[in-house]
Curated annotation (Swiss-Prot):
Annotated source species: Chlamydia muridarum (strain MoPn / Nigg)
HAMAP family assigned: LpxC (MF_00388)
Keyword tags: Hydrolase, Lipid A biosynthesis, Lipid biosynthesis, Lipid metabolism, Metal-binding, Zinc
Lineage: Bacteria, Pseudomonadati, Chlamydiota, Chlamydiia, Chlamydiales
Pfam families documented for this protein: LpxC (PF03331)
GO cellular component term of the entry, any: membrane
GO terms classed as biological process: lipid A biosynthetic process
Protein name, entry field: UDP-3-O-acyl-N-acetylglucosamine deacetylase
Cofactor section: Zn(2+)
């Protein structure tokens, strides 16, 4: 089985910002963690409210991914998780002063910068890299997700917004490595359609949303601070979300993920199918 040394941060780092949905200022702290800890969130450390970043702890997928365990809740975790997973950080303790991770500029860039500020170091234990050996599928209405055996971690994503010509149909296929994530995926911001804003606000969401942390699409126009960072920034951000959600499998793995119009709910559904397949394969090896 493939493997590499486990990795953690060299030092503690902090970041303060606003949550995109609830609009509350929050302090985020990332700390080094011991081998085999995994990625663990805490809301109130003194009361023991620890939330491992695992699929079993997903409690919500409405416009973001929310985790809950031992009475603690933390939401909008996917951008931070995508950065940690892609930068190979296996063990880290994350404390957030509020229920929602700060949004930064709507991408993973602020979290990649935090990881660089902290530095990363190898640990003594190894982490196995799992390899999918048979395909798994998930489909719901027009959403299709599949994972196929591969020698690399690759995502091929199709985004189709027939009702918005500024987005239209976008396709991107890319091997995800730390280098490609940093250059091609991490800077890509979350986005919304202009005609969705009232609906989202009525649901108590995007209370902290602004043009500093999201891109708006209205009909055939783009409303953004500056130009799009890539012509296909929306589909790249969808890939970012998918990476963050699949990191909740809890171990690095190799597969070719094919996605058509997926969101957080379907990402998590595929993640559970991949995890089940990997666990089954592990049992066969014993």
């Amino acid at each position: 089985m493939l493997g590499r040394a486990q990795r953690t941060l060299k030092r503690k780092v902090c970041y303060s910002g606003v949550g995109v949905h609830f609009g509350k200022p929050a302090m985020l702290t990332l700390e080094p963690a011991e081998e085999n800890t995994g990625v663990v969130f805490s809301r109130h450390a003194a009361s023991g409210q620890y939330i491992p970043a695992r699929l079993a702890n997903v409690c919500g997928t409405g416009r973001s991914t929310t985790l809950s365990s031992q009475g603690g809740v933390v939401s909008t975790v996917e951008h931070l998780l995508a950065a940690l997973y892609s930068c190979g950080v296996d063990n880290v303790r994350i404390h957030c002063s509020e229920d929602e991770i700060p949004i930064g500029d709507g991408s993973s860039q602020v979290f990649v910068d935090l990881i660089d500020q902290a530095g990363v170091e190898e640990q003594g234990q190894t982490v196995p890299i799992a390899r999918l050996t048979h395909p798994v599928y998930y489909q719901h209405q027009d959403t299709i997700l599949a994972a196929f055996p591969s020698e690399e971690f690759k995502i091929s994503y199709t985004l189709h917004y027939s009702h918005n010509s500024a987005i239209g149909t976008q396709y991107r296929s890319q091997v995800i490595s730390e280098e490609s994530f940093r250059k091609e995926i991490a800077p890509c911001r979350t986005f919304a359609l202009y005609n969705e804003l009232c609906f989202l606000m009525e649901r108590g969401l995007i209370g902290g949303g602004c043009l500093g942390n999201a891109v708006l699409f209205k009909d055939d126009s783009v409303i953004s601070l500056g130009k799009l960072r890539f012509p296909d920034e929306p589909v790249r951000h969808k890939m970012l979300d998918l990476i963050g959600d699949l990191s909740l499998i809890g171990k690095p793995f190799l597969a070719h993920i094919i996605a058509v119009g997926s969101g957080h709910s379907s990402n998590i559904a595929l993640g559970n199918k991949i995890l089940e397949a990997l666990q089954y394969e592990q049992e066969l090896v014993k």
